[in-house]
Structure formats: structure tokens, C-alpha cells
Amino acid sequence: MKLLPSVMLKLFLAAVLSALVTGESLERLRRGLAAATSNPDPPTGSTNQLLPTGGDRAQGVQDLEGTDLNLFKVAFSSKPQGLATPSKERNGKKKKKGKGLGKKRDPCLRKYKDYCIHGECRYLQEFRTPSCKCLPGYHGHRCHGLTLPVENPLYTYDHTTVLAVVAVVLSSVCLLVIVGLLMFRYHRRGGYDLESEEKVKLGVASSH
């Protein structure tokens, strides 16, 4: 319904323009006829210029039709722009203001930029406090604590058992070596004592 007045107005303007163009051509024809009736002599160059020939008339009619068609095309192709009412302008301003208020800056980017030591900062809008997502191996409110690796009890038990077995074997070897040395020394000392006794006996016998 809003488009109808603008379309009617454009059609009216097109009709007025076509009427003006047609009126000018009719006025020219009337002047030419009046000059011809007042001067019954054969038409001269000036009269020929006033009276349009058949080709000129056809060309004028085609020009008028083309002008009318162009005006009608422009009238139907152009879309009338809606009038900006104060209510629409206010609504547009409110929407722009709302969009500006909705975009809040993340406090983790400025205020709490260095809050998390070993982690990623995340601001909780509901509680209005920053929170940290710690990296693997760290814990704490600000990811400041280092988590030590926990040893496997089974692995610890196996390691201790191996050490104990190695210690027992080494101790046994040491004992065997010590016993062997003692036995070797005892046998060597016993042989030395026998030799000394024999020498003593031989010396006593020779003296007699």
C-alpha cells in the first residue's frame, strides 16, 4: 500500500511529460499549416523546414513512444525508499547501543593477564572471579605448585629385591674369598712349621 502513491505519482509525471512533448509537436504542425494556407505558392526551403516530411513525422512518433516507454520503465523499476520515521531511528540507535554494551572485554586479557603462572586464565562471569586451567604437572589456584611423579610400588619392590639379591651374592663371594685366603695361609704356615722342625731335628742329630 505504501508503494502505490509513489508509483501513481511517477505515472502522472510520465503522462505530463508525454503530453508536453505531444503538444510541442502539434504546435509545430499548426504553425506549418498556417504558413502554408497564408502562402499558396509552392513550398520553398523555409516552408519545407517548417513542414515535417513523412519520415520526420514517423521519427517523431517513434521518439515519443520511446520516451514514454522509458518513463514507464523507470517508474516501475525504481523502488521507493521507505520514509525514516522517528520511531525507526530511535530503535536503530537503541540496537546500536545494545550491541556496544553486549561486547564486554575479557578481564583475563588485561587485568588478569599474568594471573595464572603455569596455565590458562578463564574469567567466570557468574562469580566474577578468574580461574586457571593448569598445564599437566601443575596444580593450585594459580597453577603454582609442581606435582611430583608417583612411583609404582611394584616397580619399587622389584628394584629393592634385585638390590638385596646382588648384595647377598657379593657378600657370599667376599666370604668365600676370605675363607680361601685363610685356608691357603694356614696350609702354607703348616708346611713351613714342618720344615723348620725337620731342620731342627737334623741339626740336633748332626751335633751328636
From Swiss-Prot:
Any one cellular-component term (Gene Ontology):
extracellular region
| Role according to the record | Growth factor that mediates its effects via EGFR, ERBB2 and ERBB4. Required for normal cardiac valve formation and normal heart function. Promotes smooth muscle cell proliferation. May be involved in macrophage-mediated cellular proliferation. It is mitogenic for fibroblasts, but not endothelial cells. It is able to bind EGF receptor/EGFR with higher affinity than EGF itself and is a far more potent mitogen for smooth muscle cells than EGF. Also acts as a diphtheria toxin receptor.
For bias type Polar residues, the affected ranges are 36-51
Its source organism is Mus musculus (Mouse)
Q: Which residues lie on this side of the membrane: Extracellular?
A: 24-160
Biological process, per Gene Ontology: angiogenesis; blastocyst growth; cell chemotaxis; cell migration; epidermal growth factor receptor signaling pathway; ERBB2-EGFR signaling pathway; ERBB2-ERBB4 signaling pathway; positive regulation of cell growth
Q: Which GO terms describe its molecular function?
A: epidermal growth factor receptor binding; growth factor activity; heparin binding; receptor ligand activity; transmembrane receptor protein tyrosine kinase activator activity
Which tissues does the record link to its expression? Most abundant in kidney, skeletal muscle, lung, spleen, brain and heart.
Q: Which InterPro entries match?
A: EGF-like_dom (IPR000742)
* Family matches, as SUPFAM superfamilies: EGF/Laminin
Cite the PROSITE patterns for this sequence.
EGF_1, EGF_2, EGF_3
Which residues, renumbered to this chain, are glycosylated? Answer: T85
One Pfam short name: EGF
Q: Which residues form the propeptide?
A: 24-62, 149-208
Describe its assembly: Interacts with FBLN1. Interacts with EGFR and ERBB4.
Identify this protein by name: Proheparin-binding EGF-like growth factor
Give the stretches traversing the membrane. Answer: 161-184
Taxonomic lineage: Eukaryota, Metazoa, Chordata, Craniata, Vertebrata
Gene3D superfamilies in alphabetical order:
Laminin (2.10.25.10)
SS bonds (residue pairs): C108-C121, C116-C132, C134-C143
Write out the topological domains of type Cytoplasmic: 185-208
- Domain named EGF-like is located at 104-144
Tell me if Transport is a UniProt keyword of this record: no
